[in-house]
Curated annotation (Swiss-Prot):
Compartments, as annotated in UniProt: Nucleus
Matches recorded under InterPro entries: Mediator_Med24 (IPR021429)
Predominant location category: nucleus
Coiled-coil region list: none
Motif (LXXLL motif 5): 785-789
Motif LXXLL motif 6 per UniProt: ranges: 855-859
Motif (LXXLL motif 1): 128-132
Protein name: Mediator of RNA polymerase II transcription subunit 24
GO biological process, one term: positive regulation of DNA-templated transcription
Subunit structure: Component of the Mediator complex.
Family: Belongs to the Mediator complex subunit 24 family.
Domain of life per record: Eukaryota
Organism: Gallus gallus (Chicken)
Protein purpose: Component of the Mediator complex, a coactivator involved in the regulated transcription of nearly all RNA polymerase II-dependent genes. Mediator functions as a bridge to convey information from gene-specific regulatory proteins to the basal RNA polymerase II transcription machinery. Mediator is recruited to promoters by direct interactions with regulatory proteins and serves as a scaffold for the assembly of a functional preinitiation complex with RNA polymerase II and the general transcription factors.
Length: 986
């Protein structure tokens, strides 16, 4: 008999009562070649014929079961065929369909092409929708008294199948992919869910109801199945948070709030820190910083950071999603924990001469971070604790105003001063001078600057003083009465700007790019003439050699006058000419044309009225002394000494003593390096405080590698980083360079053999790397890791626990750098450092994917794989990643380094040589998954080649559906296909 179509063949088999295997043999004879059974829709044809009557045809059903068992038909076509049956009133038919699902629903798999695997995802979602509709139909039936028992039985069967299907993570993962692939079909599932929930309302059977509720909640969890994370509850100390806060308070008070908030949130997410403990750690770091800060400016900086900046940081943190938790409750809880640390609070109170906790609580309450009731409760508890410490009561000096109170008062004053500075200076220069004079008295200036820095107003503060400094150039209608006022306005603004640049970094002063003819005088002078740490000045630079006629008239003025005249003097020109004038005077002195008495008169003239002249003169002398031999320095140093000694007479201008204090501090900063190099002592007038804190911390005769090792060992023993250590690490990073610093710290990490020590080391190293996260990450991922992974003689160093710890550190650094890099957040401190040039990375990782990269040639240990990878005709598909589909720029060093690191990881996974380096790769990927932010398709995993997914699932610990979902970019159609193929094969 010639069979025309499938339906005829099935009917013939039924008529002749073929057995199932006989049917299969004959079918293959009827349809020998060509299309597969799925394309012929065999499963649907069999079901259609089997379900014609009120009860199913057992013989045709046996053919379908045989086809499923012998894999003639795929699971997806069977599920699709089942989901097309919608006459739920035929109970026996529904039962037999459920039995067919039982055959394979808990062990679904597909080893075909990616398209077939996506087909399985879609079919599974259709089957889920069918089961929901089925359950809803019987839930309605149960309410009819006549058919209640039968309907309950049917509904129970449906719910059991739903439970069985959904209890498998693999099935839920496949549905998750389908939901992203076909949103319209998922909408249909949601509609069926709503219908089932409505039908359950009148259901009296509690067992069925709870069973249905369980299924519903499982289905609702499918779209968010990646975002459920547990918090760490076994730890109470988090040294990374502590160190990040300390680093920011010590070195970056002027930094913007947002990058700090993002960095803290990144640490919180990566380390899974519960919110109350996270905030407790922030407060602990603030109090430790306050207690250990050196007296003077640093103490004021820390006070401003704690009482002004950190409450603002918490306000920003409040804006992040916190689930169903109340943020103010977490803040309250953190303060409750903090109250238990009585010794810490007592020490802070003693240092600050006030009840710090009370002031902090008021500030947080003002910002809406604490309720009134909680604030009162916490304040009362702290008050009671303080009564038990009599030394706090007696130690408090009623005459000394505590810094926290002064800082909180200074903050509104900053705003008022900024308004005053906006006024027209020409109308009332005397009034403005009065305000500035008041600012100079005592520690007012440092208080105001600290408050401005902590509230992000320092840049505009500096800009106002630059504008004032520029205003003093106008001298057209000047008389002897207005000349001293203009001289003082110039001098005070100049000194203040120098002081700001030295205390908070010159980047605070620098404005955004301007045309060359509009750059203010002070900015030009600071960039070209002002000595700073690590800046080498050329004393013969054109900036020190102005118009010779101006220099001659200035020399004559200084030498011949009994005192400096003020009327019609252009102070900007004087400051630029003074360096050349000093050179003339110095030459005359060295050639005995001038006597020491004449030099004294000249230096008195320089420093007697306008201190800025002395600052500019010393700036040039410092550059000059560096260039001289040991025996030639004496007279230059003597001149510095003369200029640094204040003039005590009646004939000085207003506010002279206040200006001298700032001048001395500026000169001490300028001369620090050169005095150390020449072993010279110059006594600067004492301002009653340590003017250069954290300066010159490195021991003079100890190799820097030993210093690095010993400081890191101490920090590791203590378990936290202190401010002094942060500054030492910063100096070592400057001195040794990024590669040296990173390489030696990684070596220290790999020496650790105890698990708890390695974890602590990672937490601390991550914080230390925050000194320059971008550059250290490039070095770690671009140089150090590839060297360790490609050199078989170093593989033993990657064993657990140090290898696992290094994997963790690498992922943390990669995630942080990538996140902040994409937001363009680099602190001013980091921007100042030498940037790695893109060329450094082009040579290591060529842009053109067809050229063999140096990194790939390093893979000497796996000959075949290395050859394939680096061969000129290597196909793009082996390295195609989501980042290329997202068109991420590979001109960027970080993107390039990440892409190549993942290529290397991919080649190690596919290699025939296994070892600790393979294990390292596994730890690296596990950590990536652990730290992943839900929905972050722009994460570092986008650089992973798609081909790597199938290699990864072969590793036992990575062969879970959730991990596959986490590591693939499900926002891309190709990403979904890769994920479906990998999960369906598990």
């Amino acid at each position: 008999m010639k069979v025309v179509n499938l339906k005829q063949a099935i009917l013939q088999a039924w008529k002749e009562r073929w057995s199932d295997y006989q049917w299969a043999i004959n079918m293959k004879r009827f349809f020998p070649r060509g299309a597969t059974w799925d394309i012929l829709n065999l499963a649907e044809a069999l079901l259609e014929q089997a379900m014609i009557g009120p009860s199913p045809n057992p013989l045709i059903l046996s053919y379908l079961k045989y086809a499923i068992s012998s894999q003639m038909v795929s699971y997806s076509t069977v599920l699709t065929a089942i989901s097309k049956f919608d006459d739920f009133s035929r109970d026996l038919c529904v039962q037999s369909l459920l039995e067919i699902m039982d055959m394979f629903c808990d062990r679904l798999s597909c080893h075909g092409r990616a398209e077939e695997c996506i087909g399985l995802c879609r079919a599974l979602m259709s089957a889920l929708n069918w089961l929901l509709r089925c359950a809803a139909f019987y839930a309605e039936k149960v309410k009819e008294m006549l058919e209640q028992v039968a309907a309950e039985g049917q509904m129970k069967m449906c719910l059991e199948r739903l439970e069985k299907m959904l209890s498998s993570t693999k099935n839920r993962a496949l549905i998750h992919i389908a939901q992203l692939e076909e949103t319209s079909s998922w909408n249909a599932v949601e509609q069926s869910l709503l219908k089932l929930e409505e039908s359950l309302n009148g259901l009296s059977n509690s067992t069925l109801r709870s069973q249905a509720d369980d299924c519903i909640s499982l289905i609702k969890s499918i779209p968010t199945m990646l975002s459920v994370r547990s918090e760490q509850l076994n730890k109470t100390g988090f040294p990374t948070v502590h160190a990040v806060v300390l680093l920011e308070g010590t070195m970056n008070l002027t930094g913007e709030i947002q990058p700090l908030v993002e960095q803290l949130m990144m640490v919180k997410r990566m380390q899974r820190i519960p919110p109350p403990l996270f905030m407790l750690e922030i407060w602990k770091a603030c109090f430790v910083g306050l207690i250990e800060s050196p007296e003077g400016t640093e103490e004021l900086k820390w006070t401003a950071f704690t009482f002004l900046k950190i409450p603002q940081v918490l306000v920003e943190l409040k804006n992040y999603p916190h689930g169903d938790k109340d943020f103010t409750e977490d803040v309250n809880c953190a303060f409750e924990f903090l109250l238990k640390l009585t010794p810490l609070l007592d020490k802070a109170d003693q240092r600050c001469n006030c009840n710090c906790m009370s002031l902090l609580l008021q500030e947080c309450s003002k910002q809406g971070l604490l309720s009134e009731a909680n604030m009162t409760n916490l304040t009362d508890k702290r008050k009671a604790d303080r009564e038990d410490a009599p030394q706090l009561q007696s130690a408090e000096n009623a005459n000394i105003q505590p810094n926290p109170r002064l800082i909180l008062r200074a903050e509104p004053t900053v705003t008022n001063i900024l308004k005053t500075m906006d006024a027209d200076h020409s109308k009332s220069p005397e009034g403005l001078l009065g305000v500035l004079g008041h600012m100079l008295s005592g520690k007012s200036l440092d208080l105001l600057l600290a408050a401005a820095a902590a509230t992000g107003k320092l840049k505009s503060f500096a800009w106002k003083f630059i504008k004032l400094n520029e205003f003093t150039k106008h001298i057209s209608t000047e008389n002897s009465k207005s000349a001293p006022v203009r001289a003082l306005l110039f001098d005070i603004s100049f000194l203040m700007l120098c002081h700001v640049a030295q205390t908070y970094g010159s980047e605070v002063i620098l404005s955004e790019s301007r045309p060359a003819d509009e750059v203010p005088f002070f900015e030009t002078w600071m960039l070209t003439c002002m000595p700073e740490e690590g800046k080498i000045l050329n004393p013969d630079h054109p900036c020190f050699r102005p118009d010779s006629t101006k220099v001659e008239s200035l020399v004559a003025l200084l030498n011949n006058s009994s005192e400096m005249k003020l009327v019609q003097i252009n102070w900007h020109e004087v400051c630029l000419s003074i360096s050349a004038a000093i050179l003339e005077i110095l030459n005359a002195w060295e050639n005995s044309v001038l006597t020491f008495e004449s030099i004294q008169k000249i230096t008195d003239n320089i420093k007697g009225k306008v201190c800025s002249m002395a600052v500019c003169a010393v700036a040039w002398l410092v550059a000059h002394v560096r260039m001289l031999g040991l025996d030639e320095r004496e007279k230059s140093l003597q001149m510095i000494r003369q200029l640094a000694t204040p003039l005590y007479g009646d004939n000085t201008l207003q506010f002279y003593n206040e200006r001298v204090v700032i001048m001395s501090s500026i000169l001490e900063h300028m001369c620090a390096d050169v005095l150390q190099q020449t072993a010279t002592q110059i006594k600067f007038p004492s301002t009653g405080m340590d003017t250069i804190p954290y300066w010159n911390l490195l021991p003079p005769k100890k190799p820097i590698k030993e210093v690095l090792t010993s400081v890191f060992t101490k920090v590791l023993e203590k378990g936290w980083v202190d401010s002094r250590s942060i500054h030492i690490f910063d100096s070592l990073l400057h001195m040794g360079g990024v590669y040296w610093f990173c390489n030696n710290l990684v070596k220290e990490l790999l020496k650790e053999t105890r698990k708890e020590h390695t974890l602590r080391a990672v937490e601390l190293l991550y914080a230390i790397f925050c000194l320059d996260m971008q550059q250290l990450t490039l070095t770690l991922l671009g140089h150090i890791l590839p060297n360790l992974l490609t050199d078989s003689s170093k593989w033993h160093t990657l064993m657990d626990p140090p290898g696992k710890a290094l994997a963790k550190l690498s992922v943390w650094c990669a995630l942080s750098s990538y996140s902040s890099h994409n937001k363009g957040q680099a602190s001013a401190r980091q921007k100042k450092r030498h940037r790695e040039d893109i060329e450094d990375y082009i040579s290591l990782f060529p842009l053109d994917d067809t050229r063999p990269s140096k990194l790939m040639r390093l893979l000497s240990s796996n000959e075949e794989d290395a050859n394939i990878l680096s061969s000129p005709n290597r196909s793009m598909s082996s390295s195609l990643s989501a980042s290329q589909l997202h068109a991420v720029s590979m001109r960027d060093p970080l993107n390039r380094v990440l892409a190549n690191l993942f290529l290397l990881i991919s080649s190690i996974l596919g290699s025939k040589t296994a070892g600790t380096h393979t294990q390292f790769v596994q730890w690296f990927m596990e950590e990536c998954v652990d730290c992943l932010e839900q929905g972050s398709h722009g994460s570092i995993l986008q650089f992973m080649p798609f081909t790597m997914v199938s290699e990864l699932v072969k590793v036992s610990t990575m062969s879970s559906p959730k991990i596959v979902l986490a590591i693939t970019d499900l926002g891309l159609p190709l990403g979904r296909r890769v994920a479906a193929k990998a999960i369906a094969a598990l």
